[in-house]
Amino acid sequence: MSAPSDDPPVAVITGVGRSRGIGTAVASALRDDGWRVVTAGWRRYDRLMPWGADDIPLADIEADLADPSTLAMVLERANELAGPVCAMILCHCESVDSTILDTSVESFDRHVAINARATWLLIKAFVEQFAGPPGTGRVAAITSDHTAFNMPYGASKAAIDRIVLAAAVESAALGITCNVINPGATDTGWMDFSTAAAVRARNLQPRLGAPADCANLVRFLCSPNGQWINGQLLYSDGGLRP
């Protein structure tokens, strides 16, 4: 077991690129809890999406996670910036709406590369470098239950569930907990008025999910009190009904 350290624990958070994003909310929450946070993002993705980029400062690490050669670099750079990493929070995604009929092979492959393959390789790199005391390692990944009209996103996100749950078993000897979070429909700026109204109507609580809702669950999982929760797919969606 490693000797205790007074240094703040270090977390890497991917998918940090917009002020209203889940990744940004998680970064803020963990900083408030005393973590040293290293953010990773890809500003070009947000510029290409309908909601666009905003004026949030650039992430500590800019990386296109579709390129497998960049993934080990994310952990290496985080170690250089902040020290040994003991939490990996995966909030990144590729999400371009399309159907079974009109999804291109290129789009499908990019969704799988970013949402599934990058998740696997980032967890792999994290586990390989983890040297903290048993019980202090954390992995949390954001998933989705989308299916129709967002097929490549939903299919590639579903793979995350299996990757992370496998990691919970395979990294148990190191004392790393691994969980998946489904935050439901979260108001990060992508909903138009009619979509937001439809989501509210399906929720047991009369509001939209906020990025802070998901961030609050992540901060609990990353706390000592979250150590007993492991290998789970957790819903933090306010009771969203199909």
Regions found by a protein language model. Name each.
Residues 2, 202, 219, 230-242:
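Short C-terminal tail/terminal secondary-structure segment
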Residues 3-38:
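Canonical Rossmann dinucleotide-binding motif of NAD(H)/NADP(H)-dependent dehydrogenases/reductases
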Residues 15-17, 131, 136-173, 185:
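Catalytic loop of short-chain dehydrogenase/reductase
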Residues 91-97, 238-239:
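Conserved NAD(P)H cofactor-binding loop of Rossmann-fold oxidoreductase domains
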Residues 99-100, 107-109, 199:
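Substrate-binding pocket helix/loop in short-chain dehydrogenase/reductase
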Residues 172-177, 229-231:
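Short, small/polar-rich loop/turn modules that mediate ligand/substrate recognition or access, typified
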Residues 203-214, 225:
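A conserved structural motif in NAD(P)-dependent oxidoreductases
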